[in-house]
Regions:
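A broad, structure-centric signal for solvent-exposed, well-ordered loop/edge residues
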Residues: 8, 36, 58, 71-73, ...
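Short, conserved aromatic-histidine micro-motifs
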Residues: 61-63, 242-245
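Alpha-helical cap/lid subdomain in secreted, periplasmic
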Residues: 21, 78-217, 221, 225-244
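Glycine-centered flexibility sites
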Residues: 30, 65-68, 98, 219
Length: 245
């Protein structure tokens, strides 16, 4: 009797183990606006560092974004190849570039509009070949106010992302528009709290810092929240794992 009971319990236990699913991996590829930061850079914070807090345990965020990278250099440095080796069916890839692609005076990272488009298509097609889902993000806005009006610094690059998403039927999170709205709603001076503005005397920034591109811890949390909002709006499968806040 006891032997049969133990066998039965073993079968039940094995069934639980069998159905336990491996977490979905949510990769982030991009530049310093999303990247993980070293302690020496604090309080500069990438929005990718805050994204995990918006998802339950069914999703594991793997933030591969890195300072100074563009669609070009992320490929030439083999960083994309490293992701492809582990990318599996059911995973997702958030793709946010543009800040460095637009620096065409730096040939190692800068890309023409056409090259930017070709690189994004490569990311999309190779992600889909792995039966994973690519999600395009336009680059977040810089805090660039002129006479109280926020001005665009990204030239035609965000438009390419939007057009590709539309023509190839790829989920799009329009982070340029989302972050621009937040900045405009806050206004010139109040919006500084979203960015890496540091008073002099800080251990990492002895003479202080005024950075209108990179985020503060608060700004990273706000921007990660906008990404999560975008995931919900796209209605992709990832959305069901968002934590209700």
């Amino acid at each position: 009797m006891y032997k049969n009971l133990l066998v039965g319990l073993g079968v039940i236990l094995m069934s639980f183990i069998a159905v336990k699913k491996e977490p979905i991996t949510l990769y982030i590829i991009g530049d310093s606006t999303a990247a993980n930061k070293q302690p020496k850079s604090f309080p500069e914070t990438g929005w990718g560092m805050e994204l995990q807090s918006f998802f339950d345990t069914n999703v594991k965020v793997d933030n591969r974004a890195l300072n100074g990278r563009s669609t070009k250099s992320f490929i030439t440095e083999k960083r994309w190849d490293a992701i492809l080796t582990s990318l599996k069916e059911g995973d997702f890839v958030l793709i946010e570039f543009g800040h460095n692609d637009e620096k065409i005076d730096k040939p190692e990272i800068g890309t023409s509009i056409n090259e930017f488009k070709s690189n994004l298509i490569k990311y999309i097609q190779e992600t889909q070949a792995k039966k994973a889902t690519p999600v395009l993000l336009t680059p977040i806005a810089r805090r660039n106010f002129k006479n109280g009006v926020l001005t665009n610094t990204h030239k035609g690059y965000p438009a390419i992302v939007r057009k590709l998403a539309d023509s190839l039927h790829i989920p799009l999170i329009d982070m340029e528009r989302k972050t621009s709205k937040v900045l405009m709603d806050l206004g010139d001076e109040p919006s500084k709290k979203l960015f890496n503005y540091v008073d002099s005397g800080h251990v990492n920034y002895p003479i202080g810092k005024k950075d209108d591109t990179h985020l503060s811890p608060y700004g990273a949390k706000v921007v990660a929240g906008l990404v999560a909002e975008g995931v919900k709006e796209t209605k992709i499968g990832l959305a069901k794992y968002l934590i209700k806040k």
